[in-house]
Amino acid sequence: MTLRNKDKYNVYHSSRREKLGNELSICSSIKNNNIRCFILDSRSNKKHCYGPFRSYHSLKRWILFKVKSSNALPNKLGWSYGHIKRSMDNRDNITYALIEKAPGNIFQLKGIIVAQSLVDEAELLFVFVRRDSRRTGLGAFLLNNALRHLASTGTIDVFLEVARSNRAAVLLYEKNFFRPVGTRTKYYKQGKAGAEDAIVYRRTLSS
């Protein structure tokens, strides 16, 4: 199964390149929307770009600041700023950030994916798209950029978990060739509301 981007956006690779020790990244962009998907992979030896950000670390700090100040995080499913920061700090993990340059030279974090990559398997630990950017194709664009990068690192199988009631996310994953392989009963704790099952999905990538 080959990686395909079925959404409406055209992708191109930036010609800007710069070095920062061993911490490298690559960058792609949506032409007509001034949106870029930045990849923070501390283990990569590929060329990278950080657009308006000075370095890997300044981009990471900016992402964490935006995450911390966001009121749109799905905390009801157990994710918090602390969870995301610890995941981003783990050197086995890769962060994919979708950033838009708005009028007035203002930058907005539209979505992020944090993935854990070990040998030929990866797990998407956290997938988030801002509420005002959902159902626009941006989620698929971010997801497919992440899958392309994971495939380039030798990943074969990609796993993720999603709440059974999250129909929008379920449709996104199934449209992009993820298939259910199991269920984790009462995985998501929701306080007095009880707990909700998580569906485990897998997608097998091929060269």
Each model region followed by its residue ranges:
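Acetyl-CoA-dependent GNAT
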Residues: F38-R43, R61-R134, A140-N145, H149-T153, ...
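Short amphipathic alpha-helix that is part of the acyltransferase structural core
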Residues: Y9-Y12, E23-C27, I35-G78
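Extreme N-terminal basic, low-complexity initiation segments
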Residues: T2-K8
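Short amphipathic helical patch at the helix-1/turn junction of helix-turn-helix
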Residues: V129, A163-R164
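Conserved catalytic-core motifs of GNAT/GCN5-like acyltransferases
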Residues: F159-E161, E174, R179-E196
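Conserved GNAT acetyl-CoA-binding A-motif
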Residues: A151-E161
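Short glycine/proline-centered loop/turn elements that form peptide/ligand docking sites
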Residues: G139, L143, S165-A169, K186-K192
